[in-house]
Structures are given as C-alpha cells and as structure tokens.
C-alpha cells in the first residue's frame, strides 16, 4: 500500500503545532503589502497584516497558489513514493482548487479536495484526512470521505467591524457606517456550497457579542462533536479569548 501525504493551503489556519502533530505540509498563499510580496504564515504574520491595514488604510492583497507551486509539491511527494491528498479553500472564494486540479492532471495518485470552506473549516478536513491516512485508508477513499464530511461542517464567524469588508468591496460604505454607528456585529455563515452569507446580527461591545455568538451557535445543536469544536480568532484581545 502506498504511503500517503496530506497537504493543504495555508488558509486552513491551523497552528504550527497542529500541522506538526498531524504531519501536514502547508502551501502558502502569496500576500502583497504595498511593494512587498510575502508568503502567508512563512514571512508575514496575521498581526503584521492587521497593522498594515490600520496604518495604510488599505487591505493586503492575496494571490492564489500557482499551478507551478502545486506541481512542485505534488511531484516531490509522488516521486518519493507517496499518494497525495490536498485540502483546498472553497473554489467559490479562491482559484486555489482550480490550480491544484490543473497541477494534478496526469498524476493519478494526487487528489485535490475542494473543502467548500475556509479557515479552520478546511483545517478540520485536513486533520481528519491525516487521521484516516494514519489508519491505513487509501488516498482515493480519503478524498471521497472528505467530500462527504465537508457537507456536515458548521462554520461561521462574527465580525467586530465591517470596515475590512467595505475595503474589500464586499459591502457598501453606508452599510459599514450604519453598522458601526449602531454597534452591529454581523455573523457570517459559510454554506455547504462554499459561499458566505450574513446570519444573525449582534449588538453591543465585542466581549458581549462573542459570548452571545458562541451560546447561539451551541444552543439546540445536538450534532456537536466535542473533540472537533474549534474556536479561531484573530486580532482579538486576550482577555476576551480567555473567557
């Protein structure tokens, strides 16, 4: 039976410790900060991205992983005797999956998987793939299983401000201003089709919003697997995280 390597896009947003524990190789997206081109999670941190946005008033620009980068990764592992399962960010949010599929053409033992998700939603699939590989499941079967699992993911997040959505062209300036004046914190829900939409709207300071949001996600949900709950945060004050 062939050895199996699990790889993923950096948009899975797992910690370095988790990538190491599950032996997952991460391919970074390119991030452009003005004239500086960086690689997500390699030579630029999340904190630097927020600092850049605050100081310049503009958002960093991201670029999908190139076909060539995918080819280099896939070929390196297949030539070493591995089958590869790669977990991509939703095809509705990036060209990464399309590029990975192009790179995998002609490689019968490479299986790109469209997670139909982002961030730790995709990360959940990458970890599950690593667990199945460790149990001896074939790469093709792992990919098929992930295609089933992705439909059961329950992923959402709440925003402190609409400022960055406005700068990214995803909402109007009037909507952003109104939400900020009313202290509205929208919940963004990822559908099992790989798109995002607005869910509940919360009002008040961020500490109250986060606690209300978490309660709202868990109450009445009897399909939660405790060992699979992930709380992902960014640019969040530590005192709120600790609660």
PLM regions: where:
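A general structural signal for short secondary-structure boundary/capping elements
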Residues: 51-57, 72-73, 132, 159
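N-terminal glycine-rich anion-binding loop in soluble enzyme alpha/beta folds
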Residues: 5-66
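Short catalytic-loop micro-motif centered on adjacent basic/acidic residues
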Residues: 61, 86, 112, 230-231
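Glycine-rich phosphate- or other oxyanion-binding loops that anchor nucleotides, phosphorylated ligands
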Residues: 56-58, 64-91, 95-99, 143, ...
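Short beta->alpha junction loops
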Residues: 64, 115-116
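Hydrophobic residues in alpha-helical segments
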Residues: 53-54, 78, 133, 166
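Mixed-charge interfacial surface used for oligomerization/domain docking
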Residues: 3-5, 11-21, 25, 30, ...
């Amino acid at each position: 039976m062939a050895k199996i390597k699990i790889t993923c896009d950096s948009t899975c947003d797992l910690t370095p410790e988790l990538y190491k524990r599950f032996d997952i190789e991460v391919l970074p997206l390119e991030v452009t900060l003005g004239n500086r081109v960086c690689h997500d999670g390699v030579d630029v941190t999340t904190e630097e991205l927020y600092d850049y946005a605050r100081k310049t008033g503009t958002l960093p620009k991201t670029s999908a992983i190139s076909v060539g980068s995918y080819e280099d990764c896939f070929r390196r592992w297949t030539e070493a005797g591995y089958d590869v399962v790669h977990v991509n960010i939703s095809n509705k949010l990036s060209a990464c999956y399309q590029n990975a599929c192009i790179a995998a053409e002609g490689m019968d033992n490479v299986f790109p998987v469209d997670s139909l998700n982002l961030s730790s939603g995709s990360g959940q699939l990458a970890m599950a793939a690593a667990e199945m590989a460790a149990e001896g499941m074939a790469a093709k079967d792992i990919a098929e299983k992930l295609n089933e699992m992705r439909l059961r993911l329950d992923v959402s997040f709440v925003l402190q401000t609409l400022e960055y959505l406005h700068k990214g062209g995803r909402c109007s300036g009037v909507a952003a201003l109104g939400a900020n004046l009313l202290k509205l914190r929208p919940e963004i829900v990822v559908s099992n089709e790989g798109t995002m939409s607005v869910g509940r709207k919360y009002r008040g300071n961020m500490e109250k919003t986060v606690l209300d949001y978490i309660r709202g996600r868990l109450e009445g949900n009897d399909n939660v697997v405790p060992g699979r709950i992930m709380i992902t945060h960014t640019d969040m004050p530590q005192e709120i995280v600790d609660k």
